[in-house]
Amino acid sequence: TEAEGDFDKAMEIIRKKGQAVAAKRSEREASEGCVLAKTTGDRAVIVALKCETDFVAQNADFVKLTQDILDLAVANKCATLDEVKALPMGNGTVQDAVTDRSGITGEKMELDGYMTVEGVSTAVYNHMNRNGLCTIVAFNKPVDEQLAKQVAMQIAAMNPIAIDEDGVSEEIKQKEIEVAIEKTKAEQVQKAVEAALKKANINPAHVDSEEHMESNMAKGWITAEDVAKAKEIIATVSAEKAAHLPEQMIQNIAKGRLAKFLKEVCLLNQEDIMDGKKTVREVLTAADPELKIVDFKRFTLKAE
């Protein structure tokens, strides 16, 4: 045999073969995996190890590898994913251990996520303990364990992008305003078109697309004359309404939509999932007026 009876040499040959196989599958999609989180009090960490199938993701050895990597990363206070990958593990590094496991399972694997938060106190949440979605959150002072977990659950459920409005970039706000303006203009034009069609005794739903026009003519619901008339109305009214939209009204509606967006994406502005009558900010203030969230992170394997 290649190893000539040498156990260590045999293990090295198996490892190299596994690494070669792993390299060949590097182009495949790794969309399943294991996400775990851990807190040491003033610091919390998320690690995500990806694979290709749920079968491997649920495997005890795969979960243990993820846990071991998380424990190492926490113990060494790693700042970046690259630092985690380079940590000593077994006979090599963390990255080597991932490659070895990939060779054993026959699936592409990648250490894909590494996130940290720091504060006076921190909390973690593993959604339904299914290792697919984890959150970590840091506070400016010690906080009741149940309340801290509630905030971590809020982050998991409602997927905020910032703590408050100050954390939302001007670029995102500007983009949302632009989208809101265009949406509002389109709605105003649509209302005018529908009103004009109804006035001409044409059902707007019958002529809202070329496909519907064709199929509804085939069913005998509308005539070719109706379609021609509808197209003329749609073109004329759309152009006229678009040219005379009240700018101030459009801006006011768009600003209202931006405010709604910020309420939905800012953690402190969101309705609390445990008490729908209060915002997260109000819940925290009621517990301690000086309590602040200083940072949070969220990692999920699934597209949302």
Q: For each predicted feature, which ranges?
A:
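N-terminal assembly/interaction segments in proteins that build large macromolecular machines
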Residues: 1-304
